[in-house]
Amino acid sequence: MNVLQGMAAALTPLGLLWTAIIFGVSVFLHELAHYGLARAQGVRVNSFSVGMGPVLFKKLWRGTEWRVSLLPIGGYVEIDGMAPVEDADGQWRLPTRGFAALPAWGKIAVLLAGPLTNLLLTLGLMTVSFTSQGIPALDRARIESVETGSRAQALGLRAGDVITAIDGQDIPETRRVGGQEAAGYEGVRDALAQAGRHTFTVERAEQGQPVQTRQVAFDWQPTVNGQRQLLGIRYGPDVRQVGVGQAFVTSVDTTVRAVPQLVGAFTGLFKKFFTLDISQDQNVSGPIGTAEVISRAAALSPWALVQVATLLNLSLAFFNLIPIPGLDGGRILLVLVSALRGRPLSFQQEQAINLGGFAFVMLLTLFVVVRDVSRFF
């Protein structure tokens, strides 16, 4: 299978369509927030583009040129007073009107609007998902299926049974594994990696019957004659049904808990970038990897797509707040530096910083794309 065949197998037409929709809507709302906060402070927005690249269609409305561009991979807004202006002598200088004339807090409000919108989308999508589908109960391992003829079937385990304790110890919400926080229900796997006698406390809820609790004890050897042994179950976290309020609280908690993971993921990406290490990991995907994940989610269920959209918006919010010139976080940093100095940076200083930041972001994007494509060689 050549490279193009491998990519075609990974990226389905429906998946590509959903990728364009999810990514396009997320970036469109991000840019719309910048637009709204600028207009709310009396700053003109020269153009608003849905998509990138060559303009396919444009229309002037309310002082803004609204564009539809060729590539459905995002969008942008051109806010008056953000870009350098050329004077009558052909010299470029920093603007003094529009965005440039706003106080520091006003500029930060415009710049923060985009990432905060993605964050609110994250919380909103997560709240809807938790309200409809329930929240994961990480302290309970729900058996999803039992293989016919397996050891688990012989022990009387069934799909729908819930393991609540292992060897007399209640399963915790989370546990530490190798210095990292892991879900408690995954302790089932750890138990099955150890030889000896194990006891699972199992709850079974028959329809219309009270919950039954029983102890399932068995002797276990992880390997026999060099062959890995399998209990014969597929399991995941149990689910608790909650109302909107609890779903929102859980969404906030989940988002806060995800921040250290995002920091670690992007730190790892930057290390790989600076060392030109294109080896794969599961932490950060480029556009092709993201489209592949969305293709798989589209084949599963609408709720799988909601989960991917949630993660994408959280990643967009976090990435845009990284203090790299050219990103919202970098622009906010420059505003703060100017406020602390009591005067703006010179035209040459700001241009050099922004050009360096833009080049870094473009090279990082190219690196991620190359790393994505390298999987198919």
UniProtKB/Swiss-Prot annotation:
Domain PDZ, first and last residues per copy: 109-198
Database matches in InterPro entries: PDZ, PDZ_6, PDZ_sf, Pept_M50_Zn, Peptidase_M50
Entry annotated with the keyword Membrane: yes
MF terms in GO: metal ion binding; metalloendopeptidase activity
Principal location listed in the UniProt entry: membrane
PROSITE patterns on file: PDZ, ZINC_PROTEASE
Pfam families for this protein: PDZ_6, Peptidase_M50
Active site: E31
EC number: 3.4.24.-
UniProt membrane topology term: Multi-pass membrane protein
Residues that, per the record, bind Zn(2+): H30, H34
Sequence intervals crossing the membrane: 108-130, 303-325, 351-370
CDD domains found in the cross-reference section: S2P-M50_PDZ_RseP-like
Superkingdom per UniProt: Bacteria
PANTHER family, per database record: MEMBRANE METALLOPROTEASE ARASP2, CHLOROPLASTIC-RELATED, REGULATOR OF SIGMA-E PROTEASE RSEP
Family: Belongs to the peptidase M50B family.
Protein name per UniProt: Putative zinc metalloprotease DR_1507
Organism phylogeny: Bacteria, Thermotogati, Deinococcota, Deinococci, Deinococcales
